[in-house]
């Protein structure tokens, strides 16, 4: 069941990429779905697939290599970057501008694409990113039960709790499962502040992830969402990423 779910999510993330890349990776989905954490597109560099134990590179014939082989790798083109960027923005870049200036775009299902390029600055503030050279697609996964060991400890805490860890260590995955447990098993009123859309994975008002009985503030600024929640939703617990 988990393997099927991971493959479905991985395939959904691949469909956000340009066709030139997605069509080469789709046949590898059953093999890669459980392990790939990130898909990294770097202009004029080989396509990289980041796994917990290693980084692999896609060859032109659809194979994988853990070393870069001269002349054999699939090199990311400018068209690949542009097409992927437009795709992850649903061909509505203007509507995603608030996310873009913060260096990321959240996609359907909670997958997130980090963006790197040249900053357009006005009065000391970044107002846009142009000439994008790197896109990092982080695969969102659900692992129900991963927060079981934390639940009993956290439910007894009076005060705040900070969960920290290295990048890709599973913080968001654990936090999502905690939200589910606290709002169902714990029967707490939980306000879930999902500023980047990674926890609930909201798409057109529908949650793509199981976040239990939480009240979700999707794409809100954290401070504003907290004020709204406290004023009107009477939360016993406020969760943010």
Protein language model annotation of sequence segments:
Residues 1-109:
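N-terminal accessory targeting/assembly segments
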Residues 174, 178:
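Hydrophobic positions on the alpha1 helix immediately C-terminal to the Walker A/P-loop
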């Amino acid at each position: 069941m988990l393997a099927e779910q991971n493959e479905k999510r991985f395939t959904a993330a691949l469909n956000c990429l340009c066709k030139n890349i997605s069509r080469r990776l789709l046949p590898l989905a059953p093999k890669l779905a459980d392990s790939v954490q990130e898909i990294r597109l770097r202009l004029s560099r080989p396509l990289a697939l980041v796994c917990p134990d290693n980084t692999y590179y896609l060859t032109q014939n659809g194979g994988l290599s853990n070393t870069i082989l001269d002349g054999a790798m699939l090199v990311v083109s400018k068209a690949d970057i542009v097409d992927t960027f437009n795709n992850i923005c649903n061909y509505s870049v203007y509507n995603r501008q608030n996310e873009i200036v913060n260096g990321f775009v959240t996609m359907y299902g909670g997958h997130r694409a980090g963006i790197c390029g040249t900053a357009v600055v006005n009065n000391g503030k970044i107002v846009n990113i142009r000439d994008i050279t790197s896109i990092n697609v982080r695969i969102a996964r659900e692992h129900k039960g991963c927060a079981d060991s934390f639940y009993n400890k956290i439910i007894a805490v009076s005060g705040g709790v900070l969960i920290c860890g290295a990048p890709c260590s599973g913080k968001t995955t654990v936090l999502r499962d905690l939200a589910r447990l606290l709002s169902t098993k714990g029967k707490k009123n939980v306000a879930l502040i999902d500023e980047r859309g990674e926890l609930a994975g909201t798409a057109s008002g529908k949650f793509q992830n199981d976040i239990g009985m939480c009240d979700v503030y999707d794409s809100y600024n954290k401070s504003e969402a907290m004020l709204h929640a406290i004023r009107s939703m009477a939360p016993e617990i406020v969760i943010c990423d």
